[in-house]
UniProtKB/Swiss-Prot annotation:
Its main location: nucleus. This is ATP-dependent DNA helicase DDX31. It catalyses: ATP + H2O = ADP + phosphate + H(+). Residues 841-851 have a biased composition (Basic and acidic residues).
Length: 851
């Protein structure tokens, strides 16, 4: 056999991997130049136009081929050409056998495709050529071969130096794996493993500090007996007043503080009253005031001015005290009560003072304002001066205002009766008592000796100064109040608070909760966050809202930065509602009687044990049951011992017990728990559901730049408030003990922000000593001269141009005034100027009338 013929057969029997067989479409015979159309030599293209075959059986193609050989793709009518040595070709009935060259084999095997009208329809030449190229690529590669280009898997290992031989061996091994077909079976366990890796819980539950065990000493709390068996008719009050107390206020028996205070005050003695929160101190001074004023021989006239002055620290407490006095005065219509507080119109308050107010209830700041600016206010007939929540008045920095008020009262009225009331006795209250009270009687329900005190006795019990600070002081707590504490890492504070709110207010009936924060910015941030994520205003949840939102959730906010009308509306709405969550600052921590409050949550720890007592005192009032929860960080766990030193006993609630409520809501399910029931849960599912809730918060915060900036400002406010703890608590609450990245997580931020001080820094204008001189000496063309350098003429197109402001009245300019009308005034430059003319106004009015 000739060598050239042997090589031809060898190439035909063993095509190389890189050989590309030519696919020739019907009617496009490939001929070399100079060859006859019917024949050819080696290397020439054989025409593939078929001879009309003999009639074939129905359902068979004239080009049906059956090929046996290794690999998938062999079979009747197969259009795939396996790599390797092709098997012998078998001719089907009614078909024509050509030369077994790769080109002819491919052309014959494509007959089934050509007969399909869907595959090959009449197309433009360009589209047909693209289809032919696609067919080439389809038949060229094996069905099992992976794509030629693959992404290299990202490796997190350090680079390793390899030799040339190792590189070649690696390439050969990869090539064998690439070209060897391998069948992959996907099992259910692999799918679960992939879904399990989709949920990431490391950001919340990793790198957290260890939660310490609380070694709280068991202390015996100071208890007060709230109610007594004594009735109001035993005090010798007016019958109409007793009837009003029984019917309107629905009270028949007195509390302990009322039983001891009312007789002393009816005798005309000054008193310092100290009692626990919710014990009825407001009625303890309101009843004697009303009884003494209605019993005066000369009937009180409205124009007489104030006979009683009551000072309260907050506006909400002023409204509450005014409402109580107004109810007691229903039988005595000639006595007129009134209230003065910030946020109201001064003009209307001056009009009421001009008409006359007999019982005046006011905040210190607004009263000082009227003393300095209103001539119609006078205290010549004043008989009563009451300081309600005296410790809070001093805490808010009203010492100077109290001094101004006392000087104004002492200048017009020397003889009066003074009363101080507070739940805690501090050093500031003692100083105020020394200044304002005259031979006072100390009334404390904690002291058992007060029962033996006879009000008719002329002996006066002097006020004993309390210990320095609150270190050795003890506080009375209602017996029906249960106190709890939980230690939560900083990253989980937000999720833990949301889970606790859902647990109490969504899955339980008629729950009313008050959550205390340390600043107004924190209240606003959490209010908007919970309102948009936990609560759905409509039936279908909006974007970013959880579908599990229930109508039982009702969020309200109250802080000092709100308008007075809104504060009053929120206070009234929360007082009359059966359920809801009130997010507030310490503005609601003193004296407010919020009925049916079941839970008090302190998201930020109070600055003193006295503040802690006033916060939890919003629940369990007048014998009702209530509970409180204090949320602490692991570094703040020692605060429990500080509370125990003041005889405050708290019990611990585990963080896992709070987060497990998320398993009761199906909207917090992760991917791997989609088919499982909620009752069979474990710690991993609780973590994943907490991560889902945290993701909802973070998505809401990062949905816009404004919300991210808002969260950063709230974080800055938290840090500033954290730095204001007193020196006695600095070893527990110190800024250096905070992890800013973890704390930022509790505000929905994914990273710890930088330059927090730049967020609230106000831009200050540069101070120029002589601005007029600067304007005169400034050249008009100074900017153009600066732009021109020694290498440029200043005429290039890329030089920045000064943006001219549009003239008034033009699009983009400021609105045109009525007195400014365009009047043509051509000077040297022949430019249109603006001139004030009365004629222009008249012409404009005439034109508008014509239109």
């Amino acid at each position: 056999m000739a060598p050239d013929l042997a090589s031809q057969r060898h190439s035909e029997s063993f095509p190389s991997v890189n050989s590309r067989p030519n696919v020739i479409l019907p009617g496009r015979e490939g001929r070399r130049e100079g060859l006859p159309p019917g024949g050819g030599t080696r290397g020439s293209l054989v025409p593939t136009r078929p001879v009309p075959p003999s009639p074939a059986p129905l359902g068979t193609s004239p080009y049906s081929w059956s090929r046996s050989g290794p690999g998938r793709g062999g079979g009747a009518g197969s259009s795939r050409v396996p790599r390797g040595v092709p098997g012998p070709a078998v001719c089907a009935p009614g078909s024509l056998l050509h030369h077994a060259s790769p080109t002819q084999t491919m052309a014959a095997a494509d007959g089934s495709l050509f007969d399909n009208p869907r595959t090959f329809s009449r197309r433009p030449p360009a589209q047909a050529s693209r289809q032919a190229k696609a067919t080439k690529r389809k038949y060229q590669a094996s069905s099992e071969a992976p794509p030629a280009k693959r992404r290299n898997e990202t490796s997190f290992l350090p680079a390793k130096k390899t030799s040339v031989k190792e590189t070649q061996r690696t390439f050969k091994g990869n090539a064998q794996k690439m070209f060897s077909p391998k069948k992959h079976s996907v099992s259910t366990s692999d799918r679960n493993q992939e879904e399990r890796q989709c949920i990431k819980t490391s950001s919340l539950f990793k790198n957290n500090p260890d939660i310490p065990e609380l070694h709280r000493p068991v202390v015996k709390q100071v208890q007060e007996k709230v109610f007594t068996s004594a009735a109001f008719h035993e005090l010798g009050l007016h019958p109409h007043l007793i009837s009003t107390i029984n019917t309107v206020l629905k009270m028949s028996s007195m509390t302990s503080v009322q039983k001891q205070s009312i007789p002393v005050l009816l005798e005309g003695r000054d008193a310092l009253v100290r009692s626990q929160t919710g014990s009825g101190k407001t009625l303890a001074y309101c009843i004697p005031v009303v009884q003494s004023l209605q019993a005066m021989e000369s009937k009180i006239q409205r124009s007489d001015g104030p006979y009683a002055l009551v000072l309260v620290p907050t506006r909400e407490l002023a409204l509450q005290s005014f409402d109580t006095v107004q109810k007691l005065l229903k039988p005595f219509t000639w006595i007129v009560p009134g209230v003065l507080m910030g946020g109201e119109k001064r003009k209307s308050e001056k009009a009421r003072l001009r008409k006359g107010i007999n019982i005046l209830i006011s905040t210190p700041g607004r009263l000082v304002d009227h003393i300095k600016s209103t001539k119609n206010i006078h205290f010549s007939r004043l008989r009563w001066l009451v300081f309600d929540e005296a410790d809070r008045i001093l805490d808010l920095g009203f010492e100077k205002d109290i001094t101004v008020i006392l000087n104004a009262v002492n200048a017009e009225c020397q003889k009066r009766q003074n009363v101080l009331l507070s739940a805690t006795l501090t050093e500031g209250v003692t100083r105020l008592a020394d200044i304002s009270l005259h031979d006072p009687v100390s009334i404390s329900v904690l002291d058992k000796s007060h029962d033996q005190l006879n009000p008719k006795d002329k002996a006066v019990q002097e006020v004993c100064p309390p210990p320095a600070g609150d270190k050795l002081d003890s506080f009375a707590i209602p017996e029906s109040l249960k106190q709890h504490v939980t230690v939560v890492p900083s990253k989980l504070r937000l999720v833990c608070l949301a889970a606790f709110i859902l647990q109490k207010c969504k899955f339980e009936e008629d729950q009313k909760m008050v959550v205390f924060f340390s600043s107004c910015e924190l209240v606003e941030f959490h209010y908007s966050l919970f309102l948009q994520t936990l609560l759905s205003s409509s039936g279908a949840p909006a974007s970013g809202q959880l579908p599990s939102a229930s109508m039982r959730l009702k969020f309200l906010r109250l802080h000092g930065g709100m308008e007075q009308e809104e504060r009053t509306a929120v206070f009234q709405e929360f007082s009359h509602s059966r359920r809801g969550v009130l997010l507030c600052t310490d503005v609601a921590a003193r004296g407010l009687d919020l009925p049916q409050v079941t839970w008090i949550v302190q998201y930020n720890a109070p600055s003193s044990p006295a503040e802690y007592i006033h916060r939890i005192g919003r629940t369990a009032r007048i014998g009702c049951h209530g509970s409180s929860l204090l949320i602490l960080a692991p570094s703040e766990a020692e605060y429990v011992n500080s509370l125990a030193s003041h005889k405050i006993n708290v019990s611990e609630i585990k963080m896992e017990d709070i987060l497990c409520v998320l398993t009761r809501d199906d909207c917090f399910k992760g991917k791997r728990w989609g088919a499982q029931k909620s009752h069979a849960v474990g710690p991993q599912e609780i973590r994943e559901r907490a991560t889902v809730l945290q993701t909802v918060f973070e998505d809401y915060v990062h949905s816009s730049e404004r919300r991210v900036s808002w969260a950063k400002k709230a974080l800055q406010s938290f840090i500033q408030a954290y730095a204001t703890y007193p020196r006695e608590l600095k070893h527990i609450f110190h800024v250096r003990s905070l992890h800013l990245g973890h704390v930022a997580k509790s505000f929905g931020l994914r990273d710890a922000p930088r330059n927090l001080s730049a967020l609230t820094r106000k831009k200050r204008k540069a101070h120029v000593k002589r601005p007029d001189l600067h304007k005169k000496t400034q050249s008009k063309h100074s900017l153009a001269e600066i732009l021109r350098s020694e290498y440029s003429s200043g005429m290039e197109a890329d030089i920045a141009k000064v943006k001219k402001q549009n003239a008034p009245g033009e699009p983009g300019g400021r609105p045109l005034q009525h007195s400014l009308q365009p009047t043509p005034c051509f000077g040297r430059g022949k430019t249109l100027k603006w001139r004030k003319t009365q004629k222009g106004v008249q012409r404009d009015s005439k034109t508008s009338q014509k239109v």
